Design a protein with these regions (language model features):
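Conserved Nudix-box catalytic region and its N-terminal flanking loop in Nudix hydrolases
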Residues: 17-60
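Unchanged
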Residues: 42-135
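Conserved N-terminal beta-strand and adjoining loop/helix that marks the start
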Residues: 1-22
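A generic fold-level signal
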Residues: 6-8, 16, 31-32, 79-82, ...
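Residue-level signal for short segments within beta-strands and strand-turn junctions
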Residues: 15-17, 25, 90-91, 114
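Generic marker of residues within folded, mature protein domains
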Residues: 3-5, 29, 77, 100
Length: 136
């Protein structure tokens, strides 16, 4: 459940198909996490909820609309008093991000990966890896 006392400044959304999740490798053009694998994510705009930010970032990076049902997975501290909110949605078919997405340049590769410690790509932040493994 989203905390009402934490200051969320970024959010992300994982698309889950059976035991697979969609991840993208951050391009070298990205200021944050260049070369790392992650879910579509980004900064929360002023007056935007963490869930809305996660949905918006997912669309901007993949050109795919998030399903109606999105669930809170976890959060983790980024720095000092700032937190990252992570959501997930179940999908009934594989989706493929479009090169026409608003922020398509943020990723240089996409893939579906099995939710298992030894199946996730590297490099990836410890916080992202630990959060993904909670989906098992």
């Amino acid at each position: 459940m989203i905390s009402l006392t934490k200051k969320y400044t970024a959010a992300g959304l994982i698309a889950k198909f059976n035991n697979l999740i969609l991840l993208g490798r951050r391009s070298l053009k990205c200021e944050n996490l260049s070369g790392n694998w992650s879910m579509p994510c980004g900064m929360i705009e002023p007056d935007e909820s963490p869930e809305h930010a996660a949905r918006r970032e997912f669309f901007e990076e993949t050109n795919v609309r998030a399903s109606k049902e999105v669930s809170f997975l976890t959060d983790f501290q980024m720095k000092d008093d700032e937190f990252f909110a992570l959501f997930y949605m179940k999908i009934d078919k594989l989706i493929f991000p479009s090169n026409d997405a608003i922020d398509a340049i943020e990723h240089d590769e996409w893939g579906f990966f099995k939710i298992a410690k030894n199946s996730l790509p590297s490099p990836m932040t410890r916080e992202t890896r630990n959060a993904i493994l909670k989906l098992k």
